[in-house]
């Protein structure tokens, strides 16, 4: 009883726990506490599927080409530390985050793999230095801010070049000054030079993509030749890996493909979805013809129907735009359309055509 009373201050996560003792100790109460789930709605992430997806892409790469895995935005909503830890065990070359605080959180959780920060802020350079994070440098201004912040301390950086995306990156006219500044500050070590393709998935824009590849080849060769130490290159994102093998370079950046989505049918058929959003049927109701369902009476029973009230709503991330027949769910292995508006914590599905559904079913 004392142990159960203290569960609110004890934290267990991903632990293997052995409960051993006589029946009189009522260990079943402890088991119930450990496995208890307070919310019927969960996002289940299949890490084995993620490994499959990683290997699918690796099969298209030469052995000497490494992988930079994007784990920004909570690993595309899949769990930052969990995904990063798995990728670390797969000996990934680099992890990439959008902001420094994402990288700091991974370091605090024990991740030791090299981490690239793709959208650094000058106010975070101290923390990046402390936690061994490597910022992307994309302008002379951000480079100067880094120099002022770190003084003579050493720091690894990644230089981004503009090749046609018109997002972050040094334009060609800045390259000479960039090289000169880096030569003056030898404590700043360039680990990679890279750019980003704007339309690698779109065959109709292949001429533009090939022009980007050509520009990157020219600019990166000039840049790398200006230093007396090795600097690696990367250009391709997930959708470019299959389509532009001539641009594999030293690394590729795996983003959404790692999580199961690719524009190429050849690759997509080999990928596995890693996420499954699950909930339970709270109640089943018979709704007579002519009655309405949900807010604003948007759902209308055109005939006698059976609905399932589900324990998921827009507060759980199930977008309100999925209401009124737009969204579907799987119940008992069959598709069921959402009827009526999505509520904050609930929604309703038309299960008239599905037999054997009971309260509490997944």
Language-model segment annotations:
Residues 42-44, 49-51, 65-232, 248:
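Active-site-proximal beta-alpha core segment in soluble small-molecule metabolic enzymes
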Residues 27-39, 43, 104-110, 266-274:
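C-terminal helical cap(s) of enzyme catalytic domains, especially alpha/beta-barrels
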């Amino acid at each position: 009883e004392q142990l159960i009373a203290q569960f609110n201050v004890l934290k267990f996560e991903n632990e293997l726990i052995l409960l051993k003792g006589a029946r009189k100790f009522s260990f079943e109460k402890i088991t119930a506490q450990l496995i208890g789930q307070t919310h019927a709605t969960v996002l289940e992430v299949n890490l084995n599927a993620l490994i499959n997806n990683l290997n699918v892409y690796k099969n298209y790469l030469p052995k000497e080409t490494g992988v930079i895995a994007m784990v920004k935005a909570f690993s595309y909503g899949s769990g930052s530390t969990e995904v990063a830890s798995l990728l670390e065990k797969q000996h990934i070359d680099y992890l990439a985050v959008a902001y420094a605080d994402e990288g700091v959180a991974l370091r605090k959780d024990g991740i030791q793999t090299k981490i690239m920060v793709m959208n650094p802020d000058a106010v975070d350079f101290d923390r990046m230095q402390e936690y061994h994070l490597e910022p992307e440098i994309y302008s002379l201004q951000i480079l100067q801010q880094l120099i002022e912040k770190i003084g003579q301390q050493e720091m690894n950086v990644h230089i981004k070049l503009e090749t046609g995306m018109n997002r972050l990156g040094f334009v060609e006219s800045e390259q000479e000054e960039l090289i000169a500044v880096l030569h003056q500050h030898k404590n700043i070590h360039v680990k990679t030079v890279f750019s980003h393709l704007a339309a690698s998935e779109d065959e109709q824009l292949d001429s533009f993509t090939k022009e980007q590849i050509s520009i990157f080849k020219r600019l990166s060769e000039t840049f790398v030749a200006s230093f007396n130490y090795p600097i690696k290159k990367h250009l391709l994102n997930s959708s470019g890996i299959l389509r532009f093998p001539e641009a594999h370079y030293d690394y590729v950046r795996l983003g959404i493909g790692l999580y199961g989505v690719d524009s190429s049918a050849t690759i997509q058929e080999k990928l596995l979805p890693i996420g499954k959003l699950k909930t339970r049927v709270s109640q089943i109701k018979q709704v007579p013809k002519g009655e309405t369902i949900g807010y604003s009476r948007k759902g209308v029973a055109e005939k006698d129907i059976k609905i399932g009230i589900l324990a998921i709503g827009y507060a759980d991330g199930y977008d309100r735009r999925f209401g009124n027949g737009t969204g579907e769910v799987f119940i008992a292995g069959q598709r069921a359309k959402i009827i009526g508006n999505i509520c904050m914590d609930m929604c309703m599905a038309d299960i008239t055509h599905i037999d054997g559904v009971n309260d509490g079913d997944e």
